[in-house]
Structures are given as C-alpha cells and as structure tokens.
Amino acid sequence: MAKLEILHFPDPRLRKRAVPVDKVDDEIRRLVDDMFETMYDAPGIGLAATQVNVQRQVIVIDVSENNDQPLVFINPEILDRVGEEEMQEGCLSVPGYFETVRRADRVRVRALDRNGEPFELETDGLLAVCIQHEMDHLDGKLFVDYLSPLKRNRIQKKLEKLTRQGALPKNIDRQHAI
C-alpha cells in the first residue's frame, strides 16, 4: 500500500468529473487500499479518487470511531434522498476549514463493492452526509461550493497563501474531515 497525495482547493484537477470504472480488478483494489491508507493517515472519514488525482468513480468511507468499518463505493449512484439536515463539514482537500452544509438526511445508494459485486445501502446521519459529500467530488464539486462566493473566495485566498508558505493545516477533527 502507498499513501497518495491529496489535492487541495483550489487545484483545478479537483473540478474534473470522474469516469465510471469498467471493471473492478487488482488495479482498482490497489487504488482502494491506497485510498484507505491515505484517508486514515490524514485523518479523515471519506475520500474520493478525484481527491488523489484519479478520475475514476471510487470512494472510500469509514465513519466508525475505531477505523474498523471501511466501506467502498465504486460507480455509486444515489437512488433516493429523503429529508434535510444541516451538518458541519470539512474536507481533506480544504484542510482546516469547517462549515455548515445542508444535505439530504437519508439516502439510498447503489454501487459496486471492492470485488465488483453490486449492493444497495440505505442510511442516514453522518454516513449519508459523507456519501453525498464524496459523490460531489466525483462530479467536480466541493463543499465550499455550497458557501457564499465571498466566503469561498476568502477560504481560497487563505489556502493559496498557506500553500505558498508550505504551512497547510492538517485536519485534526476526524469526525468532520470528510
């Protein structure tokens, strides 16, 4: 396994749309393993392949306290959204920033697992929010896109400055670093 480099906002590569995975093979499973290692090390609770500059529809998530419930979603598709909830979100690609975002409270999603087997999952709360957040990445969308242009621009300028200084913050609030 290998740790991958996480792209940071406003890197334009984060705006690229991911393409579906044609076949779940050893290369995809290796990517999944590397993504988990990268996510756990960051630390975070979710990571999309586009965040590590791989334009494939692959996300990994683990919202458990002990990093012992890893979930893999390949070619995920949301089938149903119910309700509305506001939750504080952060992002490994927008380190050090946490903002309130409104999303569906409950989702039903269909995807392939790490072996290419199809499955459906209906969930709510943090896992539902995390799935929606990561799926946004696959479409080139970031949680800062839900903020006002003024706030988004302020975050962008600050991160650009910190990047130039080599002083990007590390996400320390794992429960919100999606």
Curated annotation (Swiss-Prot):
Disulphide-bonded residues: none
- Does the keyword field hold Metal-binding? yes
Q: Which GO terms describe its molecular function?
A: metal ion binding; peptide deformylase activity
Q: Name one GO biological process term.
A: translation
Which gene name belongs to this protein? def
Q: Which NCBIfam families match?
A: pept_deformyl (TIGR00079), PRK00150.1-3 (NF001159)
**Which reaction(s) does the protein catalyse, per the Swiss-Prot or TrEMBL entry?**
N-terminal N-formyl-L-methionyl-[peptide] + H2O = N-terminal L-methionyl-[peptide] + formate
- Does the keyword section mention Magnesium? no
The entry's keywords: Hydrolase, Iron, Metal-binding, Protein biosynthesis
Could you say which residues bind Fe cation here?
A: C91, H133, H137
Instruction: Read off the lineage from the record.
Output: Bacteria, Pseudomonadati, Pseudomonadota, Gammaproteobacteria, Chromatiales
Name this protein carries in UniProt: Peptide deformylase
Q: How is the cofactor bound?
A: Binds 1 Fe(2+) ion.
| EC numbers, comma separated | 3.5.1.88
> Looking at the record's lineage, which domain of life comes first?
Bacteria
Cofactor names: Fe(2+)
The positions flagged as active site in the entry are E134
Q: Which family does it belong to?
A: Belongs to the polypeptide deformylase family.
Q: What is the protein's species of origin? A: Thioalkalivibrio sulfidiphilus (strain HL-EbGR7)
Tell me, in a sentence or two, what this protein's role is.
Removes the formyl group from the N-terminal Met of newly synthesized proteins. Requires at least a dipeptide for an efficient rate of reaction. N-terminal L-methionine is a prerequisite for activity but the enzyme has broad specificity at other positions.
